[in-house]
C-alpha cells in the first residue's frame, strides 16, 4: 500500500492550517491596533468629529479646504462643539478628525484583510468545509462591530457632549470578543482543535478569562464617564480604602454604571481580585505543562495593574491611558492562549 499520497495530503492540510492561522493572527493584530487607536480617539475627545456614517464614500478624507469646512460645519452643529469646544479652529478640528477617521479606516482595512483572503482560501479549497461557518460568523461579527460603533457615536450627536458609556462598553466588549475568537481559532489550527475544559485547572483558567473580560467592560465604564480623572490617589479613595457614598444614587443600580466613585471603586476591587486569582492560578499550575503560559498571564496582569495605578495617579495622561487600553487586550489575549493550552 502506497502511503505517500496520504502523507502528502496531511502535509498539505497542515500547510493550509498554518497559512489560515497566521492570516487570522494578522487580523487579530489589526484588531488590537484598532482598539488602541479607538482608545486614543476617546482620550483625545475625537470620537464625535465625524457626524455621518458613510461606509463607502466616507473612506476618503476631505481633499480640499471646502470639504474640510463642510465637515467642520457639521461638527459645529452638535452639542460637543457648542458646549465644550466652542471657538475651535479649523486646524484644531482637523486634528481630532484624523483620529476618528483613522479609527474608521482601520475598521474598513480589517474588513478587507479578512474578506479577501477568506474568499481566496475558499475558492482554492484551502479551508476545510467545517471551518467555513465559523469564519463567516467572525466576518458577521466584524460587520456588527461597525454598526455598533456608529450606534455609539449617535448617542453623542443630539443631547450629550460624549458617547453613552453603555454603548462604549458594548463596543469595546464586542471588539474584545472578536480579538479573542480570532486568536482561539488560529490556535485551533496551529495546535489542534480544543473542545472541552476537562480539568479543574482548565475550568479555573476559563473563569479567570471571564473575569478579565468583565474587568475590561468595567474599565470601559470608567473611561465612558471619565471616572479616572478624579480620586487620583492610591491605595485610598477619598481618604478611605472603602469610601463613603458608594450607593448615593437612586435607584441603587445606577451607582454601578454612572457614579464616578462607585465605577472607579469596582474597577479597583475587581483588579485586586483578578490579580489574586491569577497569582493563585500560576502557583497551582507551576508544575504542569501550562506553567509558562500561566507565568506570562501573571506577568501581564501585574504589569497591567501597575499601569492602571500609574494612570490614576497621573490623572490619565494620554500615553498612559492608551497603554492601559493596550494592556487590557494583551492580558485578554494571553489568557485566551493559556486557556487554549489547558483545553487541549
From Swiss-Prot:
Its EC number is 1.17.99.9. GO terms for molecular function: metal ion binding; oxidoreductase activity, acting on NAD(P)H, heme protein as acceptor. One of its GO terms (cellular component) is plasma membrane. Its main location: membrane. Keywords: Cell membrane, Heme biosynthesis, Iron, Membrane, Metal-binding, Oxidoreductase, Transmembrane, Transmembrane helix. The keyword Ribosomal protein does not apply. It is found in: Cell membrane. Belongs to the COX15/CtaA family. Type 2 subfamily. This is Heme A synthase. It comes from Parvibaculum lavamentivorans (strain DS-1 / DSM 13023 / NCIMB 13966).
Amino acid at each position: 500500500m502506497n502511503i505517500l499520497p496520504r502523507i502528502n495530503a496531511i502535509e498539505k492540510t497542515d500547510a493550509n492550517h498554518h497559512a489560515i492561522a497566521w492570516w487570522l493572527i494578522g487580523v487579530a493584530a489589526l484588531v488590537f491596533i484598532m482598539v488602541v487607536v479607538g482608545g486614543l480617539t476617546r482620550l483625545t475627545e475625537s470620537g464625535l468629529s465625524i457626524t455621518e456614517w458613510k461606509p463607502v464614500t466616507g473612506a476618503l478624507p476631505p481633499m480640499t479646504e471646502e470639504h474640510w469646512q463642510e465637515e467642520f460645519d457639521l461638527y459645529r452643529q452638535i452639542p460637543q462643539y457648542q458646549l465644550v469646544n466652542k471657538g475651535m479652529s479649523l486646524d484644531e478640528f482637523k486634528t481630532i478628525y484624523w483620529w476618528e477617521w483613522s479609527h474608521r479606516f482601520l475598521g474598513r482595512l480589517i474588513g478587507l484583510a479578512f474578506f479577501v483572503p477568506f474568499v481566496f482560501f475558499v475558492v482554492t479549497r484551502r479551508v476545510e468545509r467545517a471551518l467555513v461557518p465559523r469564519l463567516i460568523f467572525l466576518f458577521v461579527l466584524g460587520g456588527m462591530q461597525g454598526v455598533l460603533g456608529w450606534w455609539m457615536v449617535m448617542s453623542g450627536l443630539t443631547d450629550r457632549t460624549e458617547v453613552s458609556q453603555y454603548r462604549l462598553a458594548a463596543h469595546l466588549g464586542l471588539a474584545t470578543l472578536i480579538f479573542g475568537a480570532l486568536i482561539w481559532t488560529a490556535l485551533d489550527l496551529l495546535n489542534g482543535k480544543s473542545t472541552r475544559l476537562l480539568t479543574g485547572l482548565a475550568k479555573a483558567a476559563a473563569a479567570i478569562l471571564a473575569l478579565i473580560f468583565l474587568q475590561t467592560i468595567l474599565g470601559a465604564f470608567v473611561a465612558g464617564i471619565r471616572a479616572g480623572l478624579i480620586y487620583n490617589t492610591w491605595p485610598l479613595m477619598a481618604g478611605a480604602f472603602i469610601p463613603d457614598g458608594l450607593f448615593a444614587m437612586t435607584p441603587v443600580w445606577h451607582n454601578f454604571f454612572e457614579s464616578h466613585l462607585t465605577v472607579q471603586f469596582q474597577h479597583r476591587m475587581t483588579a485586586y481580585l483578578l490579580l489574586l486569582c491569577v497569582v493563585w492560578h500560576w502557583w497551582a499550575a507551576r508544575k504542569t505543562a501550562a506553567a509558562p503560559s500561566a507565568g506570562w498571564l501573571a506577568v501581564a496582569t501585574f504589569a497591567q495593574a501597575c499601569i492602571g495605578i500609574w494612570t490614576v495617579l497621573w490623572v490619565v495622561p494620554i500615553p498612559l491611558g492608551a497603554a492601559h487600553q493596550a494592556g487590557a487586550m494583551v492580558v485578554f489575549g494571553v489568557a485566551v492562549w493559556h486557556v487554549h493550552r489547558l483545553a487541549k
